[in-house]
C-alpha cells in the first residue's frame, strides 16, 4: 500500500515522498487537543 502510494507521488522529490509515507505511518487512533496535526483519526479532549 505504501509503495503504491509513493509511486503515485513519483513527481515529488525523495524528501517529499518520505514525508507522505511518514505521515501515513504515524496515523493514530486518537489525538488530544491542542496536539491535533492531521496525524490522527479523531481529535478529542482525552483519549481514555
Curated annotation (Swiss-Prot):
Gene Ontology molecular-function annotations: toxin activity
Pyrrolidone carboxylic acid: modified positions: 27
Keywords noted in UniProt: Disulfide bond, Neurotoxin, Pyrrolidone carboxylic acid, Secreted, Toxin
Disulfide feature: none
CC terms in the record's Gene Ontology section: extracellular region
Propeptide: 1-26
Description of post-translational modifications: Contains 3 disulfide bonds. They are not added, since framework IV presents two different connectivities (I-V, II-III, IV-VI and I-III, II-V, IV-VI).
The organism's place on the tree of life at top rank: Eukaryota
Protein localization: Secreted
Tissue specificity statement from the Swiss-Prot or TrEMBL entry: Expressed by the venom duct.
Main subcellular location: secreted
Description of its domains: The cysteine framework is IV (CC-C-C-C-C).
Family the entry assigns: Belongs to the conotoxin M superfamily.
Descriptive protein name: Conotoxin ArMLKMS-01
Organism in which the protein naturally occurs: Conus arenatus (Sand-dusted cone)
Amino acid at each position: 500500500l505504501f509503495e503504491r502510494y509513493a509511486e503515485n507521488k513519483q513527481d515529488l522529490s525523495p524528501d517529499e515522498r518520505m514525508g507522505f509515507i511518514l505521515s501515513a505511518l504515524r496515523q493514530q487512533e486518537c489525538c488530544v487537543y491542542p496536539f491535533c496535526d492531521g496525524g490522527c483519526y479523531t481529535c478529542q479532549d482525552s483519549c481514555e
